[in-house]
Every structure is written in structure tokens, then in C-alpha cells.
């Protein structure tokens, strides 16, 4: 029986910093002073530095040992570029995942569980968006192209952050619940073409919202 390792102090600090960055409490460009943050969170500098290294690897923090750390800046152009990358990769990964998992009830169960967790997430927006990412990750989990999945995971946290921009500009005309239910339904029924179409439309709509904010 495999047990899940207990969270470390670095894990706890990582989660706190991540949430504050994603929710905008720590603004783009804000300095992240190890001593100040360690005192604020009641931890030693060691787990703080480890958390900063992790966040830097994900692109959420700009960190250099001799120059200190700052919250990474995020331009609208960066967000648009990332959504274009998602459009190129994620529909392909989703289609391959569903075809590979055809007839396997464990895949359907995992996707349903991730969807239920997404629906129950909150109250913070960062928690909701993290669960949203978890749902999308479950959908693509059976993709046999592991380099593609690795690339998608590499930009996942930046994508969560940029979703804040799309959420802030949302007009209310989109029925996101319906979009995600359609993704769930297509995936668990093994309808790869339908799922790819829904995801493509979903990503294009989010990209359009980002571009609309620039007008």
C-alpha cells in the first residue's frame, strides 16, 4: 500500500505564496524578501528558499540567489502567447488520452472525481483555478505522448495565473459550467472528437476574453 508523504514546511510555504501570487495579493514585480516572508509565515529561511526555487521553476517567481526574488511580471502578450500554445497542444493531448483510455472505467472515475473536486472548490479564486487545472490534467492523464504532457504541465501554473486575467474580464455571457459538463460528458463516454471540439472552443473563448480586455 502506497502512502502519501506528509506535507513539509516548504510545501506549506509554497501553497501560501502560490495562493497570494495567483490571487494578486503579491503583485507582479513585488519583492520577495526571504527574511520578511520567513517572519510573516513563522518559518525559518530554509523552507522559504525551497518554496521560492519551486515557484521560480514554474515561472511564478523571478529568483536569483545573489539578487533576491520578485513576483514574475505577467503581460497580456505573455498570456495570449500561452493560450495559443495551449490551443496547439491540449486538444491533441486530450484526444489521445480519451482514445488510449477507451473502455477503461478507471479513467472515467478519475475524471468524474476531478470534476467533482472542481465543482466543490473554494472559496478562494486560486483554489478554484487550481481545481480547474486538476480537472484538465485528469482529462489528459492517459495521453501516451509524455513529452507533450510534460510541456503542458510545465506551463500549467502560469496558465492558472493568466486565467485570473480572463476571469477579471469575463462578461458573464459564457456558461462555463456547461462547457465543463460537456467536456466531462464527452470524455467519460469516449467521444474524443466531441471533447476536442469542446476544449478548442473553450480555450478560444478564453483567449478572446483576454484580447477583449486589451481593447
Say what each PLM segment does.
Residues 1-99, 207, 211-215:
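Short linear motifs at protein or domain termini
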Residues 57-62, 155-157, 172-174:
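Mobile beta-alpha loop/short-helix "lid" or hinge segments that flank ligand
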Amino acid at each position: 500500500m502506497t502512502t502519501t508523504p506528509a506535507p513539509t514546511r516548504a510545501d506549506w510555504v509554497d501553497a501560501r505564496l502560490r495562493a497570494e501570487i495567483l490571487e494578486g495579493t503579491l503583485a507582479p514585480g513585488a519583492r520577495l524578501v526571504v527574511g520578511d516572508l520567513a517572519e510573516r509565515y513563522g518559518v525559518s529561511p530554509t523552507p522559504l528558499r525551497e518554496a521560492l526555487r519551486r515557484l521560480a521553476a514554474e515561472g511564478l517567481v523571478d529568483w536569483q540567489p545573489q539578487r533576491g526574488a520578485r513576483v514574475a511580471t505577467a503581460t497580456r502578450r505573455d498570456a495570449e502567447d500561452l493560450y495559443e500554445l495551449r490551443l496547439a497542444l491540449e486538444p491533441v493531448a486530450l484526444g489521445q488520452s480519451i482514445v488510449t483510455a477507451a473502455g477503461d472505467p478507471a479513467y472515467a472515475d478519475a475524471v468524474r472525481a476531478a470534476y467533482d473536486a472542481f465543482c466543490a472548490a473554494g472559496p478562494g479564486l486560486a483554489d478554484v483555478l487550481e481545481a480547474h487545472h486538476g480537472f484538465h490534467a485528469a482529462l489528459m492523464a492517459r495521453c501516451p505522448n509524455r513529452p507533450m504532457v510534460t510541456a503542458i504541465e510545465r506551463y500549467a501554473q502560469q496558465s492558472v495565473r493568466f486565467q485570473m486575467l480572463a476571469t477579471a474580464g469575463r462578461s458573464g455571457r459564457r456558461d462555463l459550467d456547461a462547457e465543463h459538463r460537456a467536456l466531462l460528458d464527452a470524455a467519460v463516454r469516449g467521444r474524443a472528437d466531441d471533447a476536442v471540439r469542446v476544449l478548442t472552443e473553450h480555450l478560444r473563448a478564453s483567449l478572446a476574453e483576454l484580447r477583449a480586455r486589451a481593447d
